[in-house]
């Protein structure tokens, strides 16, 4: 009884708890069971009375009352009649809320096909019936008959007959000898009569017998759908609808506007169409109208239902009165404005406000300034409650009045309410988790929110009019999480790379840099100070300045905490900064006794954080911020026109370069170089000139000058200080202001030959200005485009990685990755220490000399270990990685390593996938926004020489060199490398040297650091001879394969190989040069082949026939592409290409086996290359290579597995197939890092590894064994391993598969959760597929749980769910015990109690 009374006042039934959601096709019985009545009329509401029409689309009898507890005619009102059905109007007396839940239905006079199963590719109905979509549509839309039962006639089942053919057949065989139907009835009959088990068995037999790939694919597709129907219990005929469900009226409302018009949901129009046509069809059937009219009406009904479910999927889009397409049920779900993305994944929040932000330098790091007016509005309910509790008001109404009048007691209460109640601040776009942080509000006058300057970097905020939103966490748990996890003081490190993110910037950096400058000959130089008091005294009396060289005593503590002091050579400015350092034995004065550039400040904060903990760091940051602002203000550093110095030597350098370009022009006119070579040389020369001028300018700015009168050092150049300290501006921008603007790029990415010689200070000429607009505009256009692209990339990344959560501590994996330092052009760009820091060692890391263990296996590498590793010069370390982690759902903590944002091992429940996605996506947007800062200034990227990066001894791997006629050593090997070994014989550096490079060192030579090892021409690729002899041409026929091109401007001719395949006569030619001896015999090469050198298109011949050549001489050369500028434009699309695992446009061809290269018979425009394996058990492998592609292998070359046969970017799938997972991982990580490194963005490798892990989750079944899978199925890797283990135990045959690499979009759509996939992309397709298969969503990932409105299974939600599971299990145990001991009544009562407690 009491339960009933409780329910009266709390009508909301406890929300049902569920663990999974299943989707399937609704049967007609199911639709009827949902429905509360049939809708017979198309009317909506009566336009005079505004009451719903009976049996219409808004009927109150079917859907429920319009007002709470009141029937339509008004006979029954109030609660006491709850549940009564009025006998006059037939309306149940209940809550009007049921109009949101109750559905209706329409009985169709003729069956219609469900458009999703018909048109969503691949068509389910088509695949099931094994008919083409066109044929099915012909039957559905009443063009052709289809034979459903051929009987004993010569007709075949599923045969289509036109009207005439049908008539002829009827005449010939008689009407009852066979059955042929038309329209959806026909398809319904066919589907209903399918015997799925038998079809599945037949298909399996066919599959085993067929040999053709195409047939196999087709059969497999069909088998899959048949199996789906069998497993899910769906019936095929349910794809044809006889009853259409009608959604509740409050979900498709009709709202009266003023002026007697109505705003209606499009669905009402679509339903109205269906009802009208259905009723007309019923009437026509009753009237026994002619067949053709009925058919037409049936077709129109089919079209109306199609439009209702998915408008525009077939035929014309149905538009409303204003020519706007009507929004169908599918459109309600799809896209950014659809149900999933608009309302389920993102919602508008109560208790929030937004305002402009201004800087609040006097705030502490954990505070923000909240305008009083805003706080009053946001915290209203809390204020009402407190007013009531304090007795200022007795009702809510009174409290409201008090607040509206803004009485003084209200302000006091607001202070109380706000104290220790954190609020969340968010700045859009929220690109990573630091875009929302919690602060404690302090009340301020005014209307703008005050933000602490140090958190600006995290929010990417500036104060030029940015706005931020404030949200109030209401529940105690929410406040707790905000305080413990989201407080700005808890987010000191950047989750992407573990570097501090609370770093002073701009003014603060400038102030601190100014403080730390040392100047010569300042007053008081050489004085010694005992403590800060003395120093302050001296400063105030101007005995010393901030920059004087002095000796000072710095006080700190030793390891036991006893005060100690030490004397340093320093300056008063640095002493003031040192005063702020926390007193700790590990924080020496040295870290601030240096020039405080932004980098050094960041290092200092990091150091303090590592050794003194979070609290000290926060206090320290606040104090150096105050100090920085104060001194930036006092220093008065400003930017003046004359601070930009134009170097005197500029004119000279420009004149020299102009002379050079004239010379190149002349060489080109004389025919010594080609147009392309000239262009490259000119661009190169101007590039060098720009660099030279920049160097001179920087030298002038850096120069220290002394005042002739006082003898004191003049103040440093202000602009140089700004740039050098890292506060603002780069060398690049200074070059454009004071040096020369340099080369510009066209919008296409090509560099314009004529540079901009002027700088902005001198001003540009008209022509220069025009050229400069190219680059500038491209920058702006790029920015707009790429912001969108980058956001989309982030979205795809988040989607693919959202269910990577730390779910256990250790998975016990015994495999991992090998880390090595990354070397680029001889420079170490990422040291091994940086790469292994915060990762778990897989094997013990041993010292190479002493052999002692530096890090045990399974321990995380810390900063102190990194120092030892770097000193020891270890070159490769095996570590655990998320990529090789063997956890079933998610990743384990050991494989992941350190949580970068906390600096400690990662916690269970951390959503590492989302963090990885944000870390990769966030700089994407930054990068895109950064292009235009360079204003499109070109940066040429081509090096033409190699310098030693270490001292040591040279060793040549795969040595193959000759001396050419000039006496230089020339590289003849294709895969030769120069190694530099240190004194202990360890490899310090490995450099690949390209074919045709000139070597300046040989095996065993010693080199100094910076010494040139080799050089080459970056713009052409030479073809050289290995043997001495006489040149003879083969198939070099003038006009066919070779043309004498006279340069237009010079008239000088050169001979170029042209595309010989373009004419029929030239199709069999193989242009080549042969080297013969005096007797005319072809010479042999060292590898045994003939000395024949095949030439590709565009090769320029460097020798005449009959010429005498020596080994190493160039006989032809191939011009390379002109240098394109590197810009993130190549970057973002490149990152997307890698993550989407697309095959690059002209991708490299990789050798699959070790062996020898042989040339096979050529095709018309392909060249056949055969690799004969070294191992006789393997078959030779053939490759077809487009002719005319620059191709560098010769017949007889030895090639190793994984080497490139044709250069280019390799396709990631090939790397996976040939070299395996680890090689793929390191390729992807390095390529993606390369793009970000170019922009100076640091991202930890582990983030990329997490994403790659998600891309590699599936294997493609090759041998199905007894697994029940079909070859070609994509199955979860770990799932297959588990099934195989079980099969082996049972003594059955396990299945096998190859790992497949899926792009991130594909991987997201293949997640086991259909809810997550549907909310990502291609909603209709995903839902159709899921419904046919009767898929179950177990709600494992984050997205599905957000959509169904539960706590996500990560972080605190993971714990809560775990506790809930344990509690339920225990309750069940207790109840079972009780059941055994006492009667069932008591146990049931207990159950009821428990459910109620849970609900509350």
Swiss-Prot record:
The gene is rpoC. Its EC number is 2.7.7.6. CDD domains: RNAP_beta'_C, RNAP_beta'_N. It is an enzyme of class 2 (transferase). DNA-dependent RNA polymerase catalyzes the transcription of DNA into RNA using the four ribonucleoside triphosphates as substrates. Mg(2+) binds at residues 462, 464, 466. It catalyses: RNA(n) + a ribonucleoside 5'-triphosphate = RNA(n+1) + diphosphate. Belongs to the RNA polymerase beta' chain family. Zn(2+) 1 binds at residues 71, 73, 86, 89. Binds 1 Mg(2+) ion per subunit. One of its GO terms (molecular function) is magnesium ion binding. SMART domains: RPOLA_N. This is DNA-directed RNA polymerase subunit beta'.
């Amino acid at each position: 009884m009491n339960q009933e009374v409780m329910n009266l006042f709390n009508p909301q039934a406890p929300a049902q708890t569920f663990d999974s959601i299943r989707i399937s096709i609704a049967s007609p019985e199911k639709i009827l069971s949902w429905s509360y009545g049939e809708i017979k009329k198309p009317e909506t509401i009566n336009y005079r009375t505004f009451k719903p029409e009976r049996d219409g689309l808004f009927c109150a009898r079917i859907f429920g009352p319009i007002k709470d507890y009141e029937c339509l005619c008004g006979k029954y009102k109030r609660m006491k009649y709850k549940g009564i059905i009025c006998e006059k109007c037939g309306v149940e007396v209940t809550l009007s809320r049921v109009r949101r839940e109750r559905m209706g239905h329409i009985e169709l006079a003729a069956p219609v096909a469900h458009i999703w199963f018909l048109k969503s590719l691949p068509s389910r109905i088509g695949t099931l019936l094994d008919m083409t979509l066109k044929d099915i549509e012909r039957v559905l839309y009443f063009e052709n008959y289809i034979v459903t039962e051929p009987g004993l006639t010569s007709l075949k089942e599923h045969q289509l007959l036109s009207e005439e053919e049908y008539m002829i057949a009827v005449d010939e065989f008689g009407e009852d000898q066979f059955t042929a139907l038309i329209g959806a009835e026909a398809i319904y009959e066919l589907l209903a009569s399918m015997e799925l088990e038998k079809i599945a068995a037949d298909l399996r037999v066919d599959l085993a017998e067929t040999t053709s790939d195409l047939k196999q694919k087709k059969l497999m597709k069909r088998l899959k759908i048949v199996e789906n129907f069998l497993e899910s219990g769906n019936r095929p005929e349910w794809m044809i609808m006889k009853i259409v469900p009608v959604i509740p009226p409050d979900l498709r409302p009709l709202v009266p506007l003023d002026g007697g018009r109505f705003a209606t949901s499009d669905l009402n129009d679509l339903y109205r169409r269906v009802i009208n046509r259905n009723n007309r069809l019923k009437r026509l059937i009753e009237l026994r109208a002619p067949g053709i009219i009925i058919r037409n009406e049936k077709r129109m009904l089919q079209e109306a239902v199609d439009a209702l479910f998915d408008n525009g999927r077939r035929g014309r889009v149905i538009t409303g009165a204003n020519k706007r397409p009507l929004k169908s049920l599918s459109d309600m779900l799809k896209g950014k404005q659809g149900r999933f993305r608009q309302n389920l994944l993102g919602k508008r929040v109560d208790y929030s406000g937004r305002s402009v932000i201004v800087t609040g330098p006097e705030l502490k790091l954990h505070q923000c300034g909240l305008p009083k007016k805003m706080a009053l509005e946001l915290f209203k309910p809390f204020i009402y409650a407190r007013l009531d509790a304090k007795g200022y008001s007795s009702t809510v109404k009174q409290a409201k009045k008090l607040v509206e009048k803004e009485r003084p007691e209200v302000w006091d209460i607001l202070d109380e309410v706000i104290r220790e109640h954190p609020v969340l601040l968010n700045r859009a776009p929220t690109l990573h988790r630091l875009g929302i942080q919690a602060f404690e509000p302090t009340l301020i006058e005014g209307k703008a929110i005050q933000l602490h300057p140090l958190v600006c970097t995290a929010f990417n905020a500036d104060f030029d009019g940015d706005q931020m939103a404030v949200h109030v966490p209401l529940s105690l748990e929410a406040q707790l999480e905000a305080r413990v996890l989201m407080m700005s003081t808890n987010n000191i490190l950047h989750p992407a790379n573990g570097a501090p993110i609370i770093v002073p910037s701009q003014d603060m950096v400038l102030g601190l840099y100014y403080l730390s400058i040392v100047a010569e000959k300042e007053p008081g130089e050489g004085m010694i100070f005992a403590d800060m008091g003395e120093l302050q005294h001296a400063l105030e009396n101007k005995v010393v300045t901030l920059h004087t060289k002095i000796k000072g005593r710095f006080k700190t503590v030793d390891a036991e905490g006893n005060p100690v002091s030490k004397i340093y050579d320093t300056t008063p400015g640095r002493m003031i900064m040192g005063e702020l350092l926390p007193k700790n034995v590990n924080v020496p004065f040295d870290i601030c006794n240096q020039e405080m550039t932004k980098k050094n400040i960041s290092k200092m904060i990091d150091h303090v954080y590592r050794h003194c903990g979070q609290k000290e760091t926060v206090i320290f940051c606040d104090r150096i911020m105050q100090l920085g602002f104060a001194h930036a203000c006092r220093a008065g550093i400003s930017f003046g026109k004359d601070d930009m110095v134009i170097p005197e030597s500029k004119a000279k350098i420009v004149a020299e370069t102009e002379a050079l370009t004239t010379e190149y022009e002349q060489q080109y006119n004389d025919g010594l170089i080609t147009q392309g070579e000239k262009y490259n040389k000119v661009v190169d020369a101007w590039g060098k000139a720009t660099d030279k001028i920049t160097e001179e300018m920087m030298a002038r700015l850096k120069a220290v000058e002394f005042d002739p009168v006082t003898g004191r050092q003049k103040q440093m150049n202000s602009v140089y200080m700004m740039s050098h300290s890292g506060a603002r501006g780069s060398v690049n921008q200074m070059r454009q202001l004071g040096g020369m603007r340099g080369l510009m790029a066209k919008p296409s990415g090509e560099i314009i030959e004529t540079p901009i010689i002027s700088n902005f200070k001198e001003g540009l000429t008209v022509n220069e200005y025009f050229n400069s607009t190219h680059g500038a505009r491209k920058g702006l256009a790029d920015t707009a485009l790429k912001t969108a692209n980058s956001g989309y990339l982030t979205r795809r990344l988040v989607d693919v990685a959202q269910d990577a959560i730390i779910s256990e501590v250790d998975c016990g994996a015994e495999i991992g990755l090998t880390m090595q330092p990354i070397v680029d052009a001889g420079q170490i760009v990422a040291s091994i220490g940086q790469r292994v820091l915060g990762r778990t060692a897989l094997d013990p890391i041993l010292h190479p000399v002493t052999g002692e263990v530096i890090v045990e296996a399974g321990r995380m590498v810390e900063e102190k270990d990194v120092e030892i590793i770097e000193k020891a010069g270890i070159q490769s370390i095996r570590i655990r990685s998320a990529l090789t982690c063997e956890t079933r759902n998610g990743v384990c903590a050991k494989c992941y390593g350190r949580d970068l944002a906390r600096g400690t091992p990662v916690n269970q429940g951390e959503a590492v996938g989302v963090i990885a996605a944000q870390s990769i996506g966030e700089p994407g947007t930054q990068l895109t926004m950064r292009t235009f800062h360079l204003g499109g200034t070109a940066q040429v990227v081509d090096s033409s020489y190699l310098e030693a990066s270490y001292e040591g001894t040279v060793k040549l791997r795969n040595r193959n060199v000759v001396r050419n006629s000039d006496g230089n050593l020339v590289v003849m090997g294709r895969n030769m490398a120069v190694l530099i070994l240190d004194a202990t014989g360890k490899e310090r550096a490995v450099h690949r040297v390209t074919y045709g490079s000139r070597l300046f060192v040989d095996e065993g030579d010693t080199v100094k650091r910076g010494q040139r090892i080799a050089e080459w021409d970056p713009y052409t690729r030479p073809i050289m001879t290995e043997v001495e002899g006489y040149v003879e041409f083969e198939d070099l026929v003038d006009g066919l394969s070779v043309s004498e091109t006279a340069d237009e401007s010079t008239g000088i001719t050169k001979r170029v190989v042209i595309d010989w395949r373009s004419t029929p006569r030239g199709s069999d030619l193989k242009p080549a040069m042969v080297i013969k001896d005096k007797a005319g015999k072809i010479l042999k090469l060292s590898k045994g082949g003939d000395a024949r050198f095949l030439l590709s298109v565009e090769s320029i011949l460097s020798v005449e026939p009959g010429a005498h050549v020596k080994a190493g001489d160039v006989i032809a050369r191939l011009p390379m592409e002109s240098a394109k500028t590197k810009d993130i434009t190549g970057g973002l699309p490149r990152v997307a290409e890698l993550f989407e695992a697309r095959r690059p446009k002209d991708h490299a061809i990789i050798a699959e086996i070790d062996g020898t290269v042989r040339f096979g018979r050529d095709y018309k425009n392909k060249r056949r290359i055969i690799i004969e394996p070294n191992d006789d058990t393997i078959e030779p492998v053939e490759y077809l290579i487009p002719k005319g592609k620059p191709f560098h292998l010769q017949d007889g070359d030895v090639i190793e597995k994984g080497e490139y046969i044709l250069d280019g970017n390799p396709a990631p799938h090939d790397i996976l197939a040939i070299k395996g997972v680890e090689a793929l991982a390191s390729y992807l990580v390095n390529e993606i890092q390369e793009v970000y490194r170019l922009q100076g963005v640091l991202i930890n490798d582990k983030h990329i590894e997490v994403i790659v892990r998600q891309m590699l989750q599936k294997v493609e079944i090759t041998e199905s064994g007894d697994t029940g899978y079909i070859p070609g199925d994509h199955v979860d890797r770990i799932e297959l391993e588990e099934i195989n283990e079980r099969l082996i135990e049972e003594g059955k045959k396990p299945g096998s598969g190859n790992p497949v690499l899926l792009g991130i979009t594909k991987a997201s759509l293949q997640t086991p959760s259909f809810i997550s996939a549907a909310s990502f992309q291609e909603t209709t397709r995903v839902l159709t597929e899921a419904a046919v298969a009767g898929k179950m969503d177990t709600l494992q990932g984050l997205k599905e749980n957000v959509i169904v409105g539960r706590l996500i299974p990560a972080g605190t939600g993971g714990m809560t769910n775990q506790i809930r599971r344990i509690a339920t299990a225990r309750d069940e145990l207790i109840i079972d015990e009780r059941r055994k001991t006492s009667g069932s009544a008591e146990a049931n009562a207990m159950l009821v109690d428990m459910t109620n407690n849970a609900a509350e």
